[in-house]
Amino acid sequence: MSLKQHTQTIFRQQFDRESDITIKAPGRVNLIGEHTDYNDGFVLPCAINYETVISCGKRDDRQIRVIAADYENQQDIFSLDAPIVPHPEYRWADYVRGVVKHLQMRNADFGGADLVICGNVPQGAGLSSSASLEVAVGQALQSLYQLPLSGVELALNGQEAENQFVGCNCGIMDQLISALGKKDHALLIDCRTLETRAVPMPENMAVVIINSNIQRGLVDSEYNTRRQQCEAAARFFGVKALRDVEPSLFFSIQDELDPVVAKRARHVISENARTLAAADALAAGNLKLMGQLMQESHISMRDDFEITVPPIDRLVEIVKSVIGDQGGVRMTGGGFGGCIIALMPLELVEQVRTTVAQEYPAHSGGKKETFYVCQASQGAGLC
């Protein structure tokens, strides 16, 4: 049974009527451009064919009623006419409540709704299950009530909900790619202007995500530390963000910076340049150059930003040993565990799968990987 059929069935069972519409919003993987988003830089993600699906219907009152199919049909009901505050128990409900509250703050004119939510974006793997949920809820209300909100506005609304209501600091990339993703394309995003450029992906190329299943310890505290170090470097150069520092200027005076701060800044500044080059390489179908840029990105994350861990480094090496210069591989996401992303010809996927299964557990304390073969997918919309 598809996610759409599943949510429609539960809607019928729980609410004794048919849903009006079903919408979806995808998760994402970032091909290159790591820890650049909060430095006003560039990122190159694609939406993936794992998504949050919501079947929904209008109500004739001012209640929002939500059922979480993935949490044993837990239910949340709240009023649009009372202050919207965090749920006393359900963490998932806060994402829904936050999106609704921030839509209200945008003066969006909408009434009550019944929602049934289900998703298959792996949680805790750095594939943006939360952004997928936020954009899906916004898209559901936008579609039900024909709200005059663009994809960029839905993405910003989701980011605000996560930052201010849920209390998790995040950049704009995850919500933006979920809202604006384009089938068979990556999206080059300027995180300062929010301008985007669709970048075609070569045909017959697989987007492979491998979860190391190494739990992402330290990620919150280390993320905040990295962010502070980047801000310190920007202050040193007298600019708003590291995006504004030319590589030539940085390399001419990097010795005057605190050595650790200099390493962090070097990653961000070089990663921005790599991301722009990668968009051009991908559009030209130059997988050899794309592979080199992804390799440089991983080395920079390992040595300058210091956010990889040995099992992740080994996993990257194992994949690279199979694909050579026919594709690229690097860690993706916040760091300290999580996933790697690999681009490769479809015909190499099974060889990579077999080699990783044979070699990786010896370097991970016996942990086995989880393997996802994805396609670059369309952003949020009707399902």
From Swiss-Prot:
Annotated metabolic or biological route of this protein: Carbohydrate metabolism; galactose metabolism
Q: Which annotated residues bind substrate? A: 34-37, 223
Which amino acid positions bind ATP, per UniProt? 124-130
In terms of InterPro entries, this protein maps to: Galactokinase, Galactokinase_bac, Galactokinase_CS, GalKase_N, GHMP_kinase_C_dom, GHMP_kinase_C_sf, GHMP_kinase_N_dom, GHMP_knse_ATP-bd_CS
- Which EC class is this protein assigned? transferase
Q: Under the cellular component aspect of Gene Ontology, which terms does the record hold?
A: cytosol
Quick check: keyword Glycoprotein in the entry? no
- HAMAP family the record matches: Galactokinase
Please report the name of this protein according to its UniProt entry: Galactokinase
Lineage runs: Bacteria, Pseudomonadati, Pseudomonadota, Gammaproteobacteria, Enterobacterales
